[in-house]
């Protein structure tokens, strides 16, 4: 019964793996809910900043911020948001495939590329392809803080404000629902004019700003862009935990199927062994009776 013992060992091994994937699935469910709450909580902040900036811009049409001007530089920037860990299905692979297409377009046009990596997977990818990484941040944990993101992101924002970049793209995975996540490569800078328009029917106001409206707009637009990056990180984190939950559930289900198949093979092997032993006993008894 050496074969039977080997099969029992395989069953035990797969059962242990199933326990691990089930535990990871449950942990991902909890983290996913918290990440979704953070993602939803971040939206009103950036929307309120956008509304204030839009009203200020309407009241001061003569002023245009550097983030809204188009530059003629032959260089673009990428902020790539990925996870720090794996085991989340094709989440990072799908995003990096979309990023690769955009990078190739830029390279074929002779445009220089500067990148900021948020997350270990994106940093590893950029290092492997030999991309120029001007800043990075990893190991944000389950509760990302804006102060950790500001430094690396500011590198590209300052470069754009100085006219060194013609565009900055934000690459992340947008959370649609628990089952679906969508990889996006969106233009962050220059800010689209329609993104800072006062919505139809929205009440506008004319406050007095100190020290002056221009200073407030300068500060608000920087905060607005930073909030968009934070929102992307929150969306990506919710997508990560959702994808990991789905992947671990699939792994748990597959482990269950493998266990059932191994048990079937074990029972067949055991039955064959018993049948063989009975045949030998019957043959031996018949031979003894014949003697």
UniProtKB/Swiss-Prot annotation:
InterPro entries: ATP_synth_F1_ATPase_gsu, ATP_synth_F1_gsu, ATP_synth_F1_gsu_CS. One of its GO terms (biological process) is proton motive force-driven plasma membrane ATP synthesis. Produces ATP from ADP in the presence of a proton gradient across the membrane. The gamma chain is believed to be important in regulating ATPase activity and the flow of protons through the CF(0) complex. This is ATP synthase gamma chain. It is a peripheral membrane protein. It comes from Variovorax paradoxus (strain S110). Belongs to the ATPase gamma chain family. It is found in: Cell inner membrane. F-type ATPases have 2 components, CF(1) - the catalytic core - and CF(0) - the membrane proton channel. CF(1) has five subunits: alpha(3), beta(3), gamma(1), delta(1), epsilon(1). CF(0) has three main subunits: a, b and c. PROSITE patterns: ATPASE_GAMMA. GO terms for molecular function: ATP binding; proton-transporting ATP synthase activity, rotational mechanism. The gene is atpG.
């Amino acid at each position: 019964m050496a074969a039977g013992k080997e099969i029992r060992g395989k069953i035990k091994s797969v059962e242990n793996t199933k326990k691990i994937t089930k535990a990871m699935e449950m942990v991902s469910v909890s983290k996913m809910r918290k990440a979704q709450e953070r993602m939803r909580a971040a939206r009103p902040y950036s929307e309120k900043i956008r509304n204030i900036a839009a009203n200020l811009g309407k009241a001061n049409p003569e002023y245009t911020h550097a983030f809204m001007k188009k530059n003629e530089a032959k260089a673009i920037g990428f902020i790539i948001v990925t996870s720090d860990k794996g085991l989340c299905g094709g989440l990072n692979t799908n995003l990096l495939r979309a990023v690769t297409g955009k990078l190739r377009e830029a390279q074929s046009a002779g445009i220089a590329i500067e990148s900021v990596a948020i997350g270990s997977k994106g940093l590893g990818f950029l290092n492997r392809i030999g991309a120029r990484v001007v800043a990075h941040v990893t190991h944000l944990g389950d509760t990302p803080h804006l102060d950790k993101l500001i430094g690396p992101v500011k590198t590209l924002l300052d470069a754009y404000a100085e006219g060194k970049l013609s565009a900055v793209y934000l690459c992340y995975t947008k959370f649609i629902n628990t089952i679906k996540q969508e990889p996006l490569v969106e233009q962050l800078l220059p800010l689209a004019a329609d993104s800072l328009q006062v919505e139809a029917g929205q009440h506008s106001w004319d406050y007095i700003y100190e020290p002056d409206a221009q200073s407030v707009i300068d500060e608000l637009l920087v905060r607005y862009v930073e909030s968009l990056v934070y929102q992307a990180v929150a969306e990506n984190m919710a997508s990560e935990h959702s994808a990991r939950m789905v992947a671990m559930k699939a792994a748990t289900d597959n482990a269950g199927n493998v266990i059932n198949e191994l048990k079937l093979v074990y029972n067949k092997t055991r039955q064959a062994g018993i049948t063989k032993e009975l045949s030998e006993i019957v043959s031996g008894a018949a031979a003894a009776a014949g003697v």
